[in-house]
Regions:
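Nucleotide/phosphate-binding catalytic cleft detector across ATP-hydrolyzing
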Residues: 1-4, 10, 18-240, 247-252, ...
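Short acidic-glycine loop/turn motifs at beta-strand connectors
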Residues: 19-21, 267-271
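A charged amphipathic helix-loop-strand protein-protein interaction module that recurs
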Residues: 290-300
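Redox- and metal-dependent alpha/beta enzyme cores, enriched for Fe-S-associated oxidoreductases
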Residues: 260-261, 281-289
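Short beta-strand scaffold segments in enzyme catalytic cores
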Residues: 13-17, 262-266
Length: 406
């Protein structure tokens, strides 16, 4: 039984093909440029020719792609975008047009074909992934499921901050079901306000199997907890993904330092006790440690992050999480995790001392942590897949079979 998992970030897209016949460590994996970086590089390469560009397809992750598109417009190079593609820049299309970008209907795409360089926008390109695996002799024609993670701010109403809108959504989901997997959905159950998740589903309508989509933030945290030292899933109930199944640590703080966003979840016996999200480019180690300490002592306020150009914070407890009881203070993952390896500097928060990180590497690979979170969430949403998936994910339960004997 195979499940394809794709964790799409700002810098990279991380791909893991789960095969129930193989130990997790022998599963095939890829770390490739993210879709937004692919668009960014293509536009940068084409920029000197000043050729008009038409961007069509779906809403996708912004950041680098949006920066490159806006650079074209500022340079006076004609830029045309279909409405769905334009939402990559902003959900309010009049703001896209204010940048000097021309919005065109889908029926106009063909007539512009000979006059522009065309570029299709989408986060998830299953045919390309399938071709890549096929070139190495691996077929994706027998998948039981596909799971894709993207970071979605949601479609905020005009005049509403997309950062605030996202945190209102996080709060709503956590209060509805306090579990990291509450942020995963079958493609048919995606909340209407989560337009980037829906765009992933729209671009994958021809899949021959169920599609699960999830937010990247909880996927990374959920996956990190499969590190054998954390022992999260050593439970008699294979389907139990609730933090109360923790036998060795009843609470922990997990921080994911991504290329574009940094977040931390405080997890306890009853689930998520607090969370904050910031932009990685706006923080350094002292600031990050200060926020984590506030998350731990339950003094963290939404404004502490939001007013500093971050997304925000949520607290669901007033109990103090005490550091120093274990051999590490915070679990760290993410491609920019080296921030915690830098020489400590005095904290501006006046609390003294540096936090002791544990660099989680589930099944020996930190970069695939989000894929393992996707895998676990998929098994929860599709119960028929749960037993083999959780049987594989439980640390120390490998079959010890060589790939040629599987």
């Amino acid at each position: 039984m195979k499940i394809l998992t794709v964790d799409i970030g700002t810098g990279t897209q991380d791909i893991f093909l789960y095969d129930s016949n193989l130990d997790i460590e022998n599963g095939f994996k890829l770390v490739l440029p993210s879709p937004t970086m692919m668009v960014y590089r293509r536009l940068k390469q084409a920029f000197p020719s000043r050729t008009p560009v038409l961007l069509y397809g779906h809403q996708m992750g912004g950041g680098p792609s949006a920066w490159a598109i806006e650079e074209y417009a500022r340079a006076g190079i004609p830029v045309y975008m279909t409405p769905d593609a334009a939402r990559t820049i902003n959900d309010e299309l009049e703001k896209v047009e204010a940048l000097g970008i021309t919005i065109v209907g889908e029926d106009e795409v063909e007539s512009l074909k000979s006059k522009v360089e065309r570029l299709e926008l989408k986060d998830f390109d299953f045919p390309l992934v399938a071709k890549t695996f096929a070139d190495y002799g691996v077929s994706l024609k027998d998948l039981a499921a596909v799971a894709v993670a993207v970071f979605d701010h949601g479609n905020a109403p005009p005049g509403v901050s997309d950062r605030q809108f996202r945190f209102d959504y996080l709060d709503e989901r956590i209060r509805a079901r306090n579990s990291l997997s509450t942020f995963a959905f079958l493609s048919s159950d995606i909340p209407p306000i989560m337009t980037r998740l829906q765009a992933v589903a729209d671009s994958a309508r021809d899949l021959p199997c169920p599609l699960v989509v999830m937010d990247t933030a909880p996927a990374a945290v959920l996956g990190a907890m499969f590190d054998s030292k954390l022992s999260v899933y050593h439970s008699n109930n294979l389907h139990d993904t609730h933090p109360s199944s923790l036998p060795t640590r009843k609470a922990m703080i997990v921080c994911n330092v991504g290329n574009f966003h940094t977040l931390a979840f405080r997890l306890g016996e009853k689930g998520i006790e607090g969370v904050f999200e910031h932009h990685t480019g706006e923080i350094d180690l002292p600031k990050l440690e200060g926020l984590i300490r506030k998350l731990a002592d339950a003094s963290l306020k939404h404004e502490d992050v939001f007013d500093d150009m971050g997304h925000g914070a949520l607290m669901y407890t007033d109990e103090v999480f005490e550091f120093g009881k274990d051999e590490f203070d915070v679990v760290v993952t993410g491609p920019r995790r080296s921030m915690f390896a830098l020489t400590p500097t005095p904290s501006p928060y006046g609390r003294g001392g540096s936090l002791r990180p544990y660099f989680a590497a589930p099944f020996g690979d930190m970069m695939i942590a989000g894929c393992f979170g996707l895998l676990a969430a998929t098994a929860e949403i599709l119960p028929d897949l749960a037993e083999p998936v959780f049987g594989s994910l439980r640390s120390g339960r490998g079959r010890g079979v060589a790939p040629w004997d599987a």
